[in-house]
Regions:
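Acidic, glycine-rich active-site loops and adjacent beta-strand->loop/helix elements
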Residues: 60-65, 231-233, 261, 340
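Catalytic adenosine-cofactor/nucleotide-binding cores of aminoacyl-tRNA synthetases and other
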Residues: 249-384
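Alpha-helix initiation and N-capping motif
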Residues: 73, 106, 110, 129-132, ...
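N-terminal Rossmann-like or analogous alpha/beta NTP/dinucleotide-binding catalytic cores
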Residues: 2-141, 235-249, 290
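Short capping/connector residues at structural and topological boundaries
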Residues: 31, 39, 65, 105, ...
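Active-site cores that bind ATP or allylic diphosphates and position pyrophosphate for catalysis
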Residues: 118, 123-256, 261-268, 277
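Short, histidine-centered active-site or binding-site loop motifs used for metal coordination
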Residues: 26-30, 60-62, 217, 221, ...
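Intrinsically disordered, low-complexity coil segments
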Residues: 13-20, 87-97, 158-165, 301-313, ...
Length: 384
């Protein structure tokens, strides 16, 4: 079945009953320690895929070379494996839609750019970074909406070079039409709308695609049927839907998840909150079972028992069995570490002595109390 056929077959009036096996993906960028949001999205992806006999794909979106951090891709593999969120396809395991790294797919994107340029749906922009900065500052000073002013649209390179603020390394921009569709049916948010976008860059001066082009092309070519992402991407959805329309391929269903927020209701940031780093939970001794349970509760209600009582402790398997998009909380919950500590304590107390000891060894080794493979005398000196 082709990518288009898979997408068309998976579209259904009932989002929780796809006609064909669904395909979902998580697509982190290797820009440092993996964000806890990667695990948050991945577990919802995986739950829906497993419930309906579909596939879960890991794609590495490494087109932002300025922010690329060596070794962070391996951290993605390691932390997702630690949580038990195993993918069916990805750079490390392969699959029918390889390659799964965007930097290895650069030849894939150019034909799509050429098509849009030839059809007049995109154009070259030679504006320098300084000229764009001045433009935005002027718009802000006049309290105007910020966005590209189309100075380059309809001009040849020679015509544009005669004007100030010229760069000989152009980008390619979408030509957003006046009648761009701004509404869609979201699996979580329901009927949703976003502001009109400006003429977004889809190909950078270095030849790398921007997120907006690459994500649409890759999701299409990998036959992704459901795109699960945070609500911060709602404003990008109209331009993505427009690209699907222009490229004449079916669009996937969108599910915009509630954001992970701190006590001040601000989005959790790795710059401000150590708990935004997925590796932090490993370092602090949280059990993966507890973290998955906690993340599920950030966007999904507890289990309601037959007697009406709520049960907040549940396994990933239980979460998968009862998963429905309609039950995802639109607003989300506060990222309360007290709740995680309580859950972690519960799961620790459920461990048998042998399992507890094996999980303690890495921490004891880090403190210099035992070797990486402790001997019986070393263990005998310990008192739990």
């Amino acid at each position: 079945m082709s990518a288009s056929d898979t997408l068309a077959a998976a579209s259904s009036p009932d989002p929780d009953a796809p006609v064909a096996p669904p395909r979902l993906r998580v697509a982190p960028s290797p820009t440092g320690d993996p964000h806890v949001g990667t695990a948050y999205m991945a577990m919802f992806d995986l739950a829906y895929a497993r419930k309906h006999g579909g596939q879960f794909v890991l794609r590495i979106e490494d087109t932002d070379r300025a922010r690329f951090v060596e070794g962070s891709e391996q951290q993605v593999y390691d932390t997702l494996a630690w949580l038990g969120l195993s993918h069916d396809e990805g750079p490390d395991v392969g699959g029918p839609y390889a390659p799964y790294r965007q930097s290895e797919r650069l030849d894939t994107y150019q034909p799509y750019v050429d098509k849009l340029l030839a059809e007049g749906k995109a154009y070259y922009c030679w504006c320098s970074a300084e000229r764009l900065k001045e433009m935005r500052e002027k718009q802000q000073a006049l309290k105007q909406p910020t966005g590209y002013d189309r100075l380059c649209y309809g001009k040849t390179e020679e015509e544009r070079a005669a004007l100030p603020g010229f760069s000989d390394k152009p980008v390619v921009r979408m030509l957003i039409p006046d009648d761009v569709e701004l509404e869609w049916d979201d699996l979580i948010m329901g009927r949703t709308s976003a502001p009109r976008p400006d003429d977004q860059v889809i190909l950078k001066a270095d030849g790398f695609p921007t997120y907006h082009l690459a994500v649409v092309v890759d999701d299409h070519e990998m036959a992704i049927t459901h795109v699960v992402r945070g609500q911060e991407w709602i404003s990008s959805t109209p331009k993505h839907l427009l690209l699907y329309k222009w490229l004449e391929v079916p669009a996937p269903r969108f599910a915009h998840m509630p954001l992970l927020r701190d006590e001040k209701r601000a989005k959790i940031s790795k710059r401000k909150n150590p708990a935004a780093r997925l590796t932090w939970f490993q370092e602090q001794g949280y059990l993966p079972e507890a973290l998955l349970n906690f993340l599920a509760l950030q966007g999904y209600p507890p289990i309601v028992e037959a007697d009406g009582t709520e049960r907040e402790v549940f396994t990933f398997e239980e979460f998968t069995q009862r998963f429905e998009w309609a039950k995802v909380n639109k607003a989300g919950a506060v990222f309360n570490l007290d709740k995680l500590n309580w859950l972690n304590g519960h799961y620790i107390r459920e461990l048998d002595a042998g399992d507890l000891a094996s999980r303690l060894i890495p921490f004891l080794h880090a403190e210099g109390l035992v070797g990486s493979h402790p001997t019986l005398p070393e263990l005998g000196r310990l008192k739990l």
